[in-house]
Amino acid sequence: GGAVLDGKVYRGHTSNALEIGHTTVDPNGPRCNCGNLGCLEAMSSGTAIAKKGKEAVSTNVETSLKKYDTITSYEVFKEAEAGDEVAKDIIDNALTYLGIGVANAIATFDPEMIIIGGGVSKAGDIVFDTVKKVVNKRCFKSMAESCEIVPAGLGSDAGVVGAVALAIIPPLVVEGALFSDWVYR
């Protein structure tokens, strides 16, 4: 996660600001790779969707996901679109949690835009329509209506490109101090 505030990348006190994916959306949810329980990432990332699909296949429940040797979020989205009820439930759950995370970010920061990247964003309209529906239900009307929710232009490569850009772009000026001076102190 990240934010641009007043034209500057906001990093926070320890340079870990806005890790929205590691905010808790379900205190009883699965353990995230960060160690926390019920993080947004553990509930709605492509990895989380694939994990839920694999769990469904390992049970006695009837699902078209069983025809795949390997299950990624792509297969779960594909079968949900084809009408598989198990896959639809997995996707609906994941996107509802994503919507809750976005609604929390909107309620906290009142941004003019939320950009969603990563693999899940490649699923397209179903992601953005569901997230917007959850945001409209959970945010003040004025905030929900004034915040644009859009896919990242870099798609699933956004994180890698952002990390490389931070490593190679000239030092940023942050409140009168050179960003590189502040980071390397």
Give the positions of each predicted feature:
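Short beta-strand scaffold segments in enzyme catalytic cores
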Residues: 1-4
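ATP-binding/phosphotransfer module of carbohydrate and carboxylate kinases, centering on a glycine-rich
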Residues: 9, 24-31, 36-185
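A short acidic/small-residue loop/turn micro-motif
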Residues: 16-19
